[in-house]
Amino acid sequence: MNTLFKIALLIATLNISVFAETNSITAAIDAGYTSSYLVNNLVQAKDAAVAGVTVGKTYAGVDFSLKGQYLPIASGTDSSHWGLGAGKSFEVLKELSVRTEAGVTRHQTGQALIQNYTEVNARVALENDFFVPYVKGIYNVELEQSGATVGIEKRFSLYDFNFAPAVEYTLLTDAKTYAVKLAVSRNIWKNLDAFTEVAYIKNDFSTSNINFALKEFDGLVGTGGLRWTF
């Protein structure tokens, strides 16, 4: 099953690259490594390579996206995460807009402690040239976890580097998470970008019956890799 999935992912990636060059869509592939794979700032996998595919298309003013990530878990059971999303921005003032997004993601966790589950979410952000506040509603169907994330982020460029610091607080049915993040990226050749993210994550669980994370985490998470945009 895992071999067939890897072959399918390779074929899909090749088809996406050809399709993106001949159609008005955006597409990207990336590969890297993470010390902890996070979903809503909860640890779903440890010390894993990550390969991803993203495809986007704008139609009638709405941005549609398809995203997938694949992790070969060390235990031998692979993990994959696939999502569909749609978003639209509404201009309020010349340099101020409201961004609304909604999506659904299927998480094949590859972990005995965390069952496979489907997440439905919706996000609203107040986009501007300064700080961007946002709120995201979350509902995990099989895990029976629901709640919201509130956060604020800032995006800016300096000396050819792109920076995106963010602070988040997430409240779910049985968990609270606090996160401080810094993402950095830089174009290194043509359509090839290098990226990294460092985050401090602190979890606070209100139950000992944990089925939504590997463990209650308090520490640093590092992620890095390369991304090719078509």
For every predicted segment, state its role.
Residues 1-28, 229-230:
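Cleavable N-terminal export/targeting peptides
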Residues 33-37, 59, 68-74, 90, ...:
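Transmembrane beta-strands of outer-membrane beta-barrel pores
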Residues 216-230:
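Outer-membrane beta-barrel "beta-signal"
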Residues 21-57:
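Outer-membrane beta-barrel initiation region
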Residues 27-29, 59-66, 93-100, 129-135, ...:
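Repeated loop/turn-to-beta-strand initiation elements of outer-membrane beta-barrel proteins
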Residues 39-47, 71-81, 107-117, 138-148, ...:
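Solvent-exposed loop/turn segments connecting transmembrane beta-strands
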Residues 31-33, 51-57, 84-88, 104, ...:
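Residues on the lipid-exposed face of transmembrane beta-strands in outer-membrane beta-barrel proteins
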Residues 162-205, 227:
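Outer membrane beta-barrel transmembrane domains
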